[in-house]
């Protein structure tokens, strides 16, 4: 097994541990406190993070880690960094709703190499390896049974594009949503893009741990990742994931409205 294959298997193992442990809390009443920005963090988030960090400490003791709850851990000189969101979607998780899961990504020399994104309520998992493609699989299936993903690339008028997003209050995008076919809700918008159910996803104000798996998945599936500044940085205010045929038109509209 190559180092890359070992990392892929470890990323899936981390996702499985997170999904299993989170499921034990799901539908219950885990203790909750609020962070300085007002967002909730529950004992489930912290328990999952603790379990993942323990695995990485044992399996990859020299690797750095970035997590939503604990921030940056490990040595800054490490070439390798794991990026974790133990429970992405804490609000729907606490409400007993769908739309939550685990985000796992690995960076090597500041380049995303491996990504796993899960939605346990759907038994769905999307994953990617740089240079080897993006895939989807059902939780519990062997990786060899995974289905490859490819985002359609045909040109598409913006008014016909199915677009969803994570927008901040008073977002400049709100007044122009009617210029496209806006998707109001989804269990996993990025998963919908990867599987052809939407054509673009707008992420306003997301964090690196929210975005890292999605960015590699979309890239490896043949889509575009655009920070509206000519690159694909994960720490900018805006990040757009899109099918190639709609990416330029959508980015142009967002720049026109001041994004």
Curated annotation (Swiss-Prot):
One of its GO terms (molecular function) is glucose-1-phosphate thymidylyltransferase activity. The keyword Transferase applies. Its EC number is 2.7.7.24. GO terms for biological process: inositol metabolic process; signal transduction; streptomycin biosynthetic process. Pathway: Antibiotic biosynthesis; streptomycin biosynthesis. Pfam families: Inositol_P. It catalyses: dTTP + alpha-D-glucose 1-phosphate + H(+) = dTDP-alpha-D-glucose + diphosphate. Transmembrane segments: none annotated. Keywords: Antibiotic biosynthesis, Streptomycin biosynthesis, Transferase. It is an enzyme of class 2 (transferase). The keyword Transmembrane helix does not apply. It comes from the Bacteria. CDD domains: IMPase_like. Belongs to the inositol monophosphatase superfamily. This is Glucose-1-phosphate thymidylyltransferase. It comes from Streptomyces griseus. The lineage of its organism: Bacteria, Bacillati, Actinomycetota, Actinomycetes, Kitasatosporales. The gene is strO.
